[in-house]
A protein has these predicted regions:
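Short S/T/G/P-rich N-terminal loop/turn motif that feeds into the first structured element of a domain
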Residues: 1-45, 51-63, 67-68, 77-94
């Protein structure tokens, strides 16, 4: 599933520093893949798109990494009506 995240950024420096870890797919838990990061020019807000096995898995990873650097809102993307989503990430062989 695709999950969108709306970030209201409280501490831009901390958000970017902590967010570097989020952008590295090898740091994410299994089944959680970062797909897009779109910050505002003034770094007061950002949106992200993730792939994940569940919304809760994405939320737990992001909230535990960013801490108080941002307030985050999550929702599952309706892929039937969405436009411009990235192709699904390849699944790792077991």
């Amino acid at each position: 599933m695709y999950v969108a995240v709306l970030h209201r950024i409280n501490d831009p420096e901390a958000m970017l520093s902590r967010g570097d870890r989020l952008g590295d797919p090898s740091s994410a838990p299994p089944g959680v893949v970062p797909r897009q990061f779109c910050p505002s020019k003034d770094l007061s807000a950002a949106t992200c798109v993730w792939e994940g096995d569940s919304l809760d898995a994405v939320r737990e990873y992001i909230d535990s990494t960013l801490g108080d650097a941002s307030e985050n809102t999550y929702f599952e993307i309706d892929t039937e009506h969405a436009q411009g989503l990235p192709e699904p990430a390849p699944m790792e062989a077991s």
